[in-house]
Amino acid sequence: MSLTLGVIGIDHRHIYGQLGQMLARGCSCKGWYTQGDPQPLAGFLQRFPDIPRASDPGTLLDDPEIDLILIADIPSRRADLAIKSMRAGKDVMTDKPGCTTLDQLAALRTCVAEMGRIWSVDFSERFEVPAVTRAAELIAEGAIGTVVQTVGLGPHRLNLPTRPDWFFDDAAYGGILTDIGSHQIDQFLYLTESDNADVVASAVGNFANPDHPGLQDFGEILLRSDKGSGYIRVDWYTPDALPTWGDGRLTILGTEGYIELRKYVDVTGREGTDHVILVNGDRCEHIDASGATLPYFDRLIQDVQNRTQTAMPQDHCFTVMELALRAQASATRLRGLANA
């Protein structure tokens, strides 16, 4: 038996992956609702033409057949929608960031505790990237010894003409560290097997978009836990010649070797995605990881059915967002920002 889904909020293209991955695993979708006519809606209708539009979100929340609500609304509205969904008896898979303030996070924690529902953030740079699955397998096999550091680089293409007004309002998107930085925090905690971490330093800035002072186009974080250290850099500087939206990379340093992931492109010329480079005492090789599985979605289906936490522990999800929010709040504000 699979799940019945509802979609609320189509303000980010990530909903394509959220819904598409679940439908590919046999789930069905009863309907969707979004405010207005956001830019990603046209692509959503092309991909999912047979799913009906609901007249209001309450229609989906009141439907007893719906098990799981998928959310990709404007980031600042996601927490409230998730809480309404959980109080209506639904589990939730939301796009990142799952919330934009510490007060929202506290309210989400309270709701999960009271309702016993699942609040899961689809950190797509792990959950939708086969290379990360393969890297985790290699680590589990002992290929690089004990992980002691990660360096996560998350460049993104700005695509300025396509961006809505909320994209330039840091109160709406939460800031660059809350938003795209949360991906990298998730991977650091996961790969180092850290339950928590300290934000040693963080910074945000606007170096290339003076006409949009609400946009943070650069951010960095230094994390440290009892298991290791992590450096994170995120930006909106992907140049036009790159054939994809970002040259996302992750280097995982172990005591007996290292792994480098070139997730979406290999600029040295290898075709395709999901390039894993492994170097240890016996091997120095490139691995095509494009055929690795994406277990998050299958496990989330099982978690909804069995009330388990195999896709992602709930505490991990909360901790990722808390660290992202704390890094954002304490970040040194570099040049070019409103109220810098």
Where are the regions that the model predicts?
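C-terminal helix-rich "cap/oligomerization" subdomain common to oxidoreductases
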Residues: 1, 7, 33, 68-70, ...
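N-terminal Rossmann-like dinucleotide-binding module
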Residues: 1-48
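A contiguous active-site-proximal alpha/beta segment in oxidoreductase catalytic domains
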Residues: 76, 99-160
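Mid-domain beta-loop-alpha active-site segment that forms a flexible
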Residues: 122-130, 161-197, 214-217, 316-317
